[in-house]
Amino acid sequence: MMVQYVNGIFLLIGFVIAPLLCYGVCRWLLPRRWRCKIGVVGAAVIILLTAYGWTFGSQQLTVRPVTIVCSDLPQSFDGYRIVQFSDAHVGTMTGWRKAMLQRAVDSIMNQRADIIVFTGDLQNIEPHELPEHLAQLSRLKAPDGVYSVLGNHDYAVYQKADSATKAANCRLTCEYERRAGWQLLLNEHRTIRRGSDSLIVAGMENWGVAKRMPHRGDVGKTLAGLQRSAFVVMLEHDPSAWRARILPQSWAQ
């Protein structure tokens, strides 16, 4: 119900509030000869862009191959394929939009990765958005597993509820990810071995510079017990944590 409410707010802004605001500003600022025409055109453009984004735009799916060269990568992992996806917000994928999630899962599986990683924001607001999508999410498989970390939305911070309810919902989100067969990393790491070589997949909880962002990431705890010679792939939802926390406090590659 909350997701439909949020979607309704966005549609109200795109189809009503923003066009009216554009028209009003044009009527107020522009010369009398042009203000009505430009206001109508501006409002129409906003409405068309909103309609496109809500229908065709949201259906766009792009795979971006990136080659990363590391001199200290263990030889056995040369050519190792990692698929990363993030910010799925599957609560938005209801009704006819469910096909988008299926297309995304199909695309991920078509990459034939050695490992799949998800870097947070599986839900919009609450874990009750997730059960109807577990069948699709459970299709994600890779030889070395599927790993995930939590994003700010996964902590239920945007839900209007007391702290105990939010904590319970966060635990439920974690449980759903595990039911999908994902290995959720909460300030912890796993070791992937190939012969005598190894690669560390570390997952740090969310840490962000914004005030409302959860600050649960702990670099020391995430890498506890590892030697500095270990090759580390660090998973984290918020990009700001890379320079602010991870680089100064670790040797993660």
Where are these regions (language model features)?
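Hydrophobic alpha-helical transmembrane segments in integral membrane proteins
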Residues: T50-S71, T92-G95
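Short, charge-rich amphipathic segments
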Residues: L30-A44, T67-P74, M100-I116
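Soluble catalytic domains of enzymes that build or remodel membrane lipids, polysaccharides, and related
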Residues: S76, Y80-Q253
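Non-catalytic terminal accessory segments
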Residues: M1-L61
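Sparse, context-dependent recognition of short Cys/His-centered cofactor- or disulfide-binding micro-motifs
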Residues: C36-V40, I46-G53, T67, L73, ...
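Generic intrinsically disordered, low-complexity segments enriched for polar/acidic and small residues
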Residues: M2, P74-F77
